[in-house]
């Protein structure tokens, strides 16, 4: 009887030990799976953030561009990042424009970023007279048009976008007289140079491309007139990709960027 009792106790003990081991293994496996799921979740979140991040001009790049001095005879624009945009094409989610607020000096010193499509190509006949005077603005004299109200996001590619940045199908015009989208720009930089890249964007939109387009006037310190403007764009299908810095200069004139005041300089050349 004693032997049978011991055998039963040993059997029960062995069964309990085995059961404890099985439970421990099960719990451990669940913990590992839970950790794996958490890790995978974090990785997916990081990947999603990387895919949806806007990109574009960084603060460090802004400061580097602000330090550049134009020299007579230099080209009107230079490539940035070897001409490749740092915008993320996957950030295009809806047709809109993000208009940055004016800074404490009432300057458009931050990036405006547009998410554009074909319907944003504007009808030129709907333009109206501009009256906003951005910082650094000085009136033009007859026969001497050197100042322009430069758009960050061009009128020609902003049809239907209201001043809040939302698309309104009732608004057939492009952006006009929006203080958050204008800066004092030279006629040469605006009409001869910036238009080159605005045309590229417009052509891409007419091909039914979706385009992320960013424009950032570059100011040095507390100066009221921008030293230049960074333009970059990328199409979601990869057919458009540029990144340039346009100097805010005018042949035959030099500017005090602190005030925007111009003085004649016949030998001042821009290529």
Locations of regions flagged by a protein language model:
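Polybasic, low-complexity association/targeting segments
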Residues: 68-117, 244
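Intrinsically disordered, low-complexity peptide-like regions
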Residues: 12, 40-42, 246
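N-terminal Lys/Arg-rich, disordered targeting/topogenic segments
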Residues: 1-11
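Domain-level detector of nuclease and nuclease-like folds
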Residues: 109-271
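Hydrophobic single-pass membrane-insertion segments
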Residues: 28-39, 231-234
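Membrane-embedded alpha-helical bundles that constitute the cytochrome b-like, heme-associated redox core
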Residues: 13-14, 52-61, 197, 266-270
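N-terminal, intrinsically disordered, polar/charged segments of Gram-positive cell-envelope systems
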Residues: 33-89
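Hydrophobic membrane-insertion alpha-helices, especially the h-region
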Residues: 15-29
